[in-house]
């Protein structure tokens, strides 16, 4: 069994100061995918310790973005080159091939999609990234190798994924054009092959496990009573191809017990894979 946790840490050093380390020690995680690391590799090594093997892709601007995958086993291969050099994708995509303790191949992809802002160059950059991501997703989906794409994808695919979806129809994160990319990766919710992982598509593990329910959410604003009232967004995902999705034994969003015990505005998304 491999337990994989993905979380946007909003700066890994700050997260550890606020209580991430006790959570990690108690989590039983074998593979840890972090987004918005905002730190150097040396910082990760110092915080995580010698038990972890780390693959890290830093952003081109210091103190921005950054993704990392840490595992308890060695890496067979690491890939960070993503898309044309004319597009700055640094700090947003890293792939790691490992062999699980049971001797099975596994590819873990960690992704941090731009937050965007409707009608601005930030949104243009988000679409540019999503286009490149879609091409790579098709390549990954064409392989039978067990593969999962995790991370903060900064889009709610369906109305079930956002508490206040009607008020966000014109906002980045729930724009029709953004959600259409998820239709390509997972299938449209009204299609017969939705979320089955057929035809090179992926399975939204969270939706597969929880079914047609609102949420459960993975992000809540720090402002107001959003966390206490569970006014959240489900924008953090495990997207597994069919061979891997068939091995899922457990999935949960590890929501903090209270506002003051949070160490990020995102909650870890954890899945167990029998592989």
Predicted regions and their residues:
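Short Gly/Pro-enriched turn/cap motifs at secondary-structure boundaries
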Residues: 57-60, 84-86, 226-230, 259-262
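Surface polyanion/phosphate-binding segment centered on an Asp-His-Pro turn
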Residues: 252-275
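Structured beta-strand-rich core segments of catalytic domains in phosphoester-bond hydrolases
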Residues: 38, 43-116
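Metal-dependent phosphoesterases centered on the DNase I-like endonuclease/exonuclease/phosphatase
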Residues: 51, 129-231, 235
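Active-site beta-strand/loop signature of hydrolases that rely on acidic residues for catalysis
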Residues: 4-9, 20-42, 108, 136-159, ...
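Surface-exposed cleft-lining segments at the edges of enzyme active sites
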Residues: 83-84, 113-130, 167-172
């Amino acid at each position: 069994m491999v337990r994989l946790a993905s979380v946007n840490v909003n700066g890994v050093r700050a997260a550890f100061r606020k209580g991430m380390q006790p959570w990690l020690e108690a989590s039983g995680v074998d593979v840890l995918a972090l987004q918005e690391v905002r730190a150097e590799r040396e910082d990760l090594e110092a915080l995580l310790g010698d038990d972890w093997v780390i693959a890290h892709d830093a952003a081109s601007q210091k103190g921005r973005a950054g993704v990392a995958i840490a595992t308890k086993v060695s890496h067979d291969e690491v890939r960070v080159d993503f898309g044309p050099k004319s597009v700055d994708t640094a700090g947003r995509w890293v792939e790691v091939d490992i062999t699980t303790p049971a001797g099975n191949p596994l590819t873990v992809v960690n992704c941090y999609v731009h937050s965007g802002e409707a009608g601005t160059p930030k949104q243009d950059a988000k679409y540019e990234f999503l286009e490149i991501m879609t091409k790579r997703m098709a390549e990954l989906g064409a392989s039978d190798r067990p593969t999962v794409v995790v991370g903060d994808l900064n889009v709610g695919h369906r109305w079930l994924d956002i508490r206040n979806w009607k008020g966000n129809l014109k906002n980045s994160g729930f724009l029709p054009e953004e959600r259409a990319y998820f239709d390509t990766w997972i299938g449209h919710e009204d299609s017969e092959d939705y979320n089955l992982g057929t035809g090179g598509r992926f399975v939204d593990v969270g939706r597969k496990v929880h079914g047609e329910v609102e949420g459960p959410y993975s992000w809540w604003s720090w402002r107001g009573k959003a966390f206490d009232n569970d006014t959240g967004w489900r924008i953090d995902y495990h997207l597994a191809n069919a061979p891997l999705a068939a091995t899922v034994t457990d999935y949960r969003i590890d929501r903090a017990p209270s506002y003051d015990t949070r160490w990020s505005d995102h909650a870890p998304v954890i899945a167990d894979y029998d592989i």
